[in-house]
């Protein structure tokens, strides 16, 4: 679309309306099976942002059908822009597997997503940086500032095409490497807001915000999650790599956006946790969801499970025609060329942008608790070092609440000033993929469309028409009555049984007393003993001043003082590493910014943050 055509459109509303008609998505396989009353209104296609370099970004816009009850009550006039990460991973992941209104069936037909975020707002998915997904260019972005400028140019062109959206409250949302994009894009909008856009808030899920802080979460998180065995022969190598990462961070001459030494921690953990006794496809833990497994060294690159179906669907000729592509393009989830060129060397990390942004808008950081690569512990470590208000770092006067959805506790929420942290239970790197209906509550939380209880918050349950209700507690009265009926009658034991029971309790009490005495004077050690040599570790998760660490402490051979302690030693817990509950004491030096953690070698090897 030429600049002259766009200029003409700004002068003639009829022209704008006509141009919108060209972007309507009129049909998709299976769309006719969805009732018209709940069928989303869709526009899609390319917008030119740089004619000289043949740069056009692809978008897919979803609107909820008119007269939706939710839009008239809880939510009014709101627009979400959703961005996936990478760098170089398509936001069609979000559209077709996460927050969009459609899913793809095994028949390669669309069907409704019961957890669509269009129940709470209109939503716009953008493939960026240029070259990602269906977008294309002759000149790839290399820096975050450059990507932000291109995104701002896209928004200006988009608002010319859809001027009615300029009055909507804007929220930027996304996951993973979007933890870099979103703060940069918000800053660009604020500094160049000639359109008077009302940017209300940011939502970042399992975000990659500060590579240095977050890389140091991998070892403690992996141990706490249980997929890394502290008894593993490879544990020494993992800890050695952790130490190298810490040294690289502390090195004032190392200005790398992301330190190679820190990237290697992650790879060493995947190698150390490999189980070669299992079938090949189950040997490696899934880096995006440690409940699942994959081939080694893919370790999650074959996830999510719905990706092959979505890939086939988006590469159908009929689908690409319906999406108004200017020319056919083979869709890949992640583009290797984009990742290869996007190597920020002159950008500060997005962590450094957050304090100023928090002065102007609400920011929600959410994390699925089963992710490894951008795990919840790493987000908590980022928050501890983040200036939330001038002079205040981390949560100091926050309130933690349980999050209730449809009568179930689905997470924890902590808020102070404009910052909210949400830990989502039983979910992966892609929270909306696992829990679509629950995830919609993330937007309810940032917009305060909730009900509060004494210790909990409750987010609404929506139906397909947008009607909603708040369900604080599930009523399972009938089920409880059935369970009560099925209980066997109580059995009354003889006097001999009770005498024996008292004797057993007495023995247990003696063993516990012995256990207490043997451990009363024992010291905690921040690291697993790697050898009998008395060598103090340079990398630690406790400050030495806090625990009185010296070279002699905790390194002498420990002899069991009781039968119960012997059992603990046999199980591998005697005198071993004590996990640390937070990352406050990790020594950090000022660091630079970040690119993606994993190199994509080619279009076929799609591996990295999403």
Curated annotation (Swiss-Prot):
Molecular functions per Gene Ontology: serine-type carboxypeptidase activity
Active site annotation, chain numbering: 176, 371, 429
Q: Which residues form a coiled coil?
A: none
Q: Which residues are glycosylated?
A: 68, 192, 196, 418, 426
Which residue ranges are assigned to the Lumenal compartment in the record's topology? 19-494
Q: Which reaction does it catalyse?
A: Preferential release of a C-terminal arginine or lysine residue
InterPro entries per the record?
Answer: AB_hydrolase_fold, Peptidase_S10, Ser_caboxypep_his_AS, Ser_caboxypep_ser_AS
Which positions make up the signal peptide?
1-18
Mark the transmembrane ranges: 495-515
Transcription as a keyword?
no
Where are the residues of the annotated region Disordered?
Answer: 469-491
EC number annotated for this UniProt entry: 3.4.16.6
Q: Name one GO cellular component term.
A: membrane
Topology in the lipid bilayer is annotated as: Single-pass type I membrane protein
The principal location of this protein is Golgi
Sorted alphabetically, the keyword list is: Apoptosis, Carboxypeptidase, Glycoprotein, Golgi apparatus, Hydrolase, Membrane, Protease, Signal, Transmembrane, Transmembrane helix
Pfam families documented for this protein: Peptidase_S10
Q: Which Gene Ontology biological process is one annotated for this entry?
A: apoptotic process
Q: Which stretches face the Cytoplasmic side?
A: 516-610
Keyword Oxidoreductase, does the record have it?
no
The listed locations are: Golgi apparatus, trans-Golgi network membrane
Family membership noted in the UniProt record: Belongs to the peptidase S10 family.
Per the entry, what this protein does is: Protease with a carboxypeptidase B-like function involved in the C-terminal processing of the lysine and arginine residues from protein precursors. Promotes cell fusion and is involved in the programmed cell death.
Q: What is this protein called?
A: Pheromone-processing carboxypeptidase KEX1
Question: What is the source species?
Answer: Ogataea parapolymorpha (strain ATCC 26012 / BCRC 20466 / JCM 22074 / NRRL Y-7560 / DL-1)
């Amino acid at each position: 679309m030429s600049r002259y055509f766009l200029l003409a459109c700004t002068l003639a509303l009829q022209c704008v309306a006509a141009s919108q008609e060209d972007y309507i998505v009129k049909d998709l396989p299976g769309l006719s099976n969805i009732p018209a009353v709940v069928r989303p209104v869709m526009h899609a296609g390319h917008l030119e942002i740089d004619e000289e370099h043949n740069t056009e970004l692809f978008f897919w816009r979803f609107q909820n059908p008119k007269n939706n009850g939710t839009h008239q009550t809880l939510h009014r006039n709101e627009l979400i822009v959703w961005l996936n990460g990478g760098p170089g991973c398509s936001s069609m992941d979000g559209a077709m597997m996460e927050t969009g209104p459609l899913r793809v069936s095994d028949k390669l037909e669309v069907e409704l997503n019961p957890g669509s975020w269009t129940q709470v707002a209109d939503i716009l998915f953008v493939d960026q940086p240029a070259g990602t997904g269906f977008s294309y260019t002759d000149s790839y972005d290399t820096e975050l500032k450059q990507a932000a400028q291109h995104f701002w140019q896209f928004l200006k062109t988009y608002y010319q095409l859809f001027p009615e959206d300029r009055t909507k409250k804007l929220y930027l949302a996304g996951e993973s490497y979007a933890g870099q994009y979103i703060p940069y894009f918000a800053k660009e909008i604020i500094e160049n807001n000639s359109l008077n856009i009302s940017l209300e808030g940011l939502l970042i899920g399992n975000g990659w915000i500060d590579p240095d802080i977050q890389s140091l979460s991998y070892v403690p998180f992996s141990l706490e999650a249980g997929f890394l065995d502290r008894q593993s022969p490879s544990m020494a190598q993992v800890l050695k790599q952790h130490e190298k990462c810490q040294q690289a961070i502390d090195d004032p001459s190392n200005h790398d956006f992301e330190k190679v030494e820190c990237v290697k921690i992650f790879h060493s953990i995947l190698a150390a946790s490999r189980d070669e006794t299992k079938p090949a496809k189950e040997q490696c833990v899934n880096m995006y969801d440690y409940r699942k497994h994959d081939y080694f060294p893919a370790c999650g690159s074959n996830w999510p499970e719905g990706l092959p179906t979505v890939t086939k669907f988006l590469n159908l000729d009929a689908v690409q025609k319906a999406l108004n592509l200017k020319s056919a393009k083979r869709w890949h989830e992640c583009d290797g060329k984009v990742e290869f060129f996007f190597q920020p060397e002159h950008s500060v990390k997005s962590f450094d942008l957050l304090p100023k942004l928090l002065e102007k808008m609400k920011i929600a950081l959410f994390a699925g608790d089963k992710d490894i690569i951008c795990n919840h512990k790493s987000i908590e470590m980022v928050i501890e070092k983040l200036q939330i208000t001038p002079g205040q770092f981390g949560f100091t006067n926050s309130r933690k609440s349980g999050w209730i959805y449809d009568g179930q506790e689905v997470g924890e929420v902590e808020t102070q000033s404009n910052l909210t942290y949400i830990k989502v239970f039983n979910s992966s790197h892609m929270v909306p993929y696992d829990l679509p209906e629950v995830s919609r509550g993330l937007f309810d939380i940032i917009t305060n469309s909730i009900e509060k209880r004494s210790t909990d918050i409750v987010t609404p349950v929506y139906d397909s028409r947008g009607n909603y209700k708040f369900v604080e507690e599930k009523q399972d009265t009938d089920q409880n009555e059935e369970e009560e009926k099925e209980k066997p009658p109580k059995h009354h034991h003889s006097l001999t049984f009770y005498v024996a029971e008292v004797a057993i309790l007495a023995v247990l009490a003696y063993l516990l007393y012995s256990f207490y005495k043997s451990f009363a004077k024992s010291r905690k050690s921040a690291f697993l003993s790697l050898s009998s040599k008395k060598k103090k570790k340079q990398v630690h998760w406790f400050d030495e001043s806090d625990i009185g660490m010296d070279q002699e402490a905790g390194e002498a051979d420990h002899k069991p003082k009781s039968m119960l302690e012997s059992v603990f030693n046999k199980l591998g817990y005697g005198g071993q590493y004590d996990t640390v509950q937070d990352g406050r004491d990790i020594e950090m030096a000022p660091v630079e910014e970040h690119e993606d953690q994993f190199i994509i070698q080619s279009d076929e090897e799609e591996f990295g943050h999403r």
